[in-house]
Every structure is written in C-alpha cells, then in structure tokens.
Amino acid sequence: MKRLRLIVAAALLALAGPVGAQRPAGVVPAALPLPAPLAATDSGQVFSLTDLLTFVALRHPVARQAGLLPERALQEVRYARGLFDPAATSKYYGKTFGGKDYFHDWDSQLRVPLWFGADLKAGFDRGVGTYVNPESYTAPAGLSYVGLSVPLAQGLLIDERRAAVRQAQALQGLAEAERRGALNKLLLQAAKDYWDWSLNYQRLQLLDRNTGLANTRFEAVRQRVVFGDLAAIDSVEALTELQNRQATLAQARVQFRNSTLLLSNYLWNEQNQPLELPAAARPQVLPGPAAWQPLPPDSVAALAELAQRIHPELQKSRAKLNQLGVERRLLSNKLLPKLSVDYNLLQAGQPFSPESPASLNGNYLQNNYKLGVSFAYPLLLRQERAKLQLNRLKLRETELDLQQDTREIQTGVRTVANEWEALREQLRLQEQVVQNAERLRVGEQIRFENGESSVFLINSRESTLVSARVKLAELQAKYAQTQATLRWAAGGVE
C-alpha cells in the first residue's frame, strides 16, 4: 500500500505538468480577492490556468449548484432522524347536557421512539362522569403510567424509521459523489477551453510574425524592382503572399477573440455577476520540452486502482448499492409477522416522579399494569415477496452497472495514458520537423541573397516553417489537455 501511494503521488506530480509550474513575473495571483486581476491588467499580464480553475471552483454557478448537493443530503439525514423525535400529545373530550356531566376524558402522553424499534411511553389518563366508557374510567385523581411498546418480529431488527436514516446517510455519499462529478466535468472543460485559448494566442503570435516578415519582404522586393534588380512579377508574388498571410492572420485574430469570450463564460464575481476577461490578459505558455515527461513506472496501474476507489461514478453506484441494501433488509423484515407487546405500569394520581416514588415490589407489579399483544400476518405475502424480488433485480442491475463502469473507467485511464505517450513522441518528432524547416528557410534565404533562389521559394519555406510551428503548438495544447483528461479519468481534477 505504501508503494502504491508513492506511485500515485509521482503520477499526480507528473500530471500537474504546466499547471503546477512556477509562474512568471506579473502572473495574476490565485489568492483572494479573486476579482482583482479582472479589474485591471497591464500589457503582458498572465492569467494562468490555476487562476481560472480557482475562479471556476469558487464562483461558477454550476460549481455553486454542485456545492448545494451535500447540504441537501445533510437535511435529508436530519429529516430522517426527525422520525425519532419525541412527541407529546394531549386529548380532552367532555360532554355536559341539561346540567348533567355525561363524561370527561383526558389523555396526555409523551412518546419517545428508541433506536432499537421500541417506543417508550409516559402519560396521564383521567376519565370521569356519569356515562363514561368503562374502559376509560379512572378514579377522580386520574391514572398515570409509564410503558414500553416493543415489536418482537417485524420491526425488531429494522423498521421504516431506521431504514430512512440509513438510506439518508447513504445519500450523503451519493450527493458528495455527484458534487465531485459535476465539478470535475466543469473543471475539465474549463481546462480544455483554457488550452484552446492559449493555442489560439500562440497561433496568433506566430502568424503575426509571419505576416510581418512577408510585409518586410514585400517592401524589400518592391525596392529592388524599382532599382531593376528583380523582375516586376516578383513584387506581385510578394504582395500576393502578404495578402494571403494577412487574411490568415485576420482569421486567427477572430479565433483568439472568440476563445477569449468563451473563457469569460467561466468568470463570475461574488455577487453572481458575469465578468469579462480583459483584452490585455494573456495565457500562460504552452508546455515546453521540459514538461514532456513520461509517466512514472507502474503509474498507469496505480491510477487505474485510484480511479476504482475514488471515481465519482463508481462512488455513486456504491452509494446506490448501500441504499438498495438497506431497502432489501427492510423488505426481508416485512416477511415476518407483526407481533408487538405493549406494557404500561400504572399508578393512581399524579405521574411517576422522584418526589413520590412508587413501591415497585412484586405485588405492586402484578396488580398495577396494562398489557396488550397484537398480531397480524398476511396469508399470501404477494406484495411483500414481489417488492423483495424487485429489490433484488435492482441490486443486480446496479452491480452490473458498477462492473461495467469500473471496466470502462480503467480502460479510459489506460487509453488516455497511451495518448499521453503517443503525444510525447509526436512532440519530439514535430520539434525536429520545426528545426529542419528552420534550417531550410535559413538556407533558402542565403540562396536568395546570392541570387540562386526566388521569392516564391522563400515564401514556400516560410509557409512550411510556420505550419510546422502551428502544428507543434497544437500538439502542445493537446498534450496539456491530455494531462487534464488523465486527471479526470483517474477520478478528479479538483
């Protein structure tokens, strides 16, 4: 187990990736108050992924809504425990007609439900009058009693009250799993949108520099055409390339603005008012070669085991099994007959109290009591047996769902881990492609300056280079998203 903890810890450190990296100067702080970074930013200020996830976890409406689930479950437990609240009742019925007192019945009782199924009772009865029911008649001083009502078959081991409490307690685990599941999905999507925003920013920077190079080349070619060093068609070639790059840059600028707006959907203040990400805010850099680390040995198996224990979907299924298990015990108990015994110890006059203790000897107990026994039992039990069978079917369905979900989650962890390793290899190869494209561009530039190349070839080399760099940025963003996805697949992003 200790070795498993070490493996999981190492895996989570590797999964932290760029999220846990040290922030550069000017980074928006994650500490509260959170709205400060969004109130005013200066050029180049970084809004990091940690800042975004902090905003989302604390203030996003979905996160706040998910935070209400445990409180609802707590109130369900309180409601169920209310079934064991003591209850005081008092009833009085009297009749006087024609100046004659027919009867006066007064019944007051305190009933305290006990956890093991019995009810503790204490009360005072007084029934007097000319026509009072003999069953209710007492001496003028009244009759006090203490007693116990105990089920001896159905309701002895479990009853509706205890089942309601147990199911409400299981609901707490279900609510916590639902809260974590909803928050994890929200944080995962926020992380993916953040890296899309970072990718669009990186693409915009690359295309802006590429357009600047095309503009510089166009001006230089135009001057050389004026001086007669190049043919006029070369200036047309340079201008066409510049216009193409300007169109591509405009599209990239729109994509960046749209991704900025999309990211703003996650930003809310303490008053539940939406916030806008300032135009000057910039994302943290995409993960570089230093972050392209392999997963620690045995980490995939450790993460799969971790997911099996803490994944919200599996915890929800286990909580449902607990609830169904409590229901099965209750329904099985319903097959027993209803047999209960009521015993009340009686005393004339005021209720039992330490100031006037009764002499509870054997003779008193034998001559001052009220005893009742009740019995009921359905002959066919069709309803009870059908409900129990339905419960068993639900249990089996939930167990099968748990098995399937466990298999899918473990497969999901391994699938994302495979994508992680594949992306590492793709990143390494793409970095080499960028380096080779840079060498080709530099070589073509030298050939052009020596009069051995053309504007068309220079533009072609630059287009190949910028395409390679954009693809590298896309792989970097996908790598960062895969890190977040692996954390989610293992059971949590928060």
Provide a role label for each language-model segment.
Residues L34-G44, K91-V150, A281-P296, R328-N333, ...:
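Small/polar, glycine/serine/threonine/aspartate-rich low-complexity segments that form flexible
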Residues R64-L68, R81, W115-A141, A153-E178, ...:
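Sec/SRP-type N-terminal targeting helices
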Residues A21-F103, L148, L152-A163, Q167-Q169, ...:
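Bacterial Sec-pathway N-terminal export signals of envelope proteins
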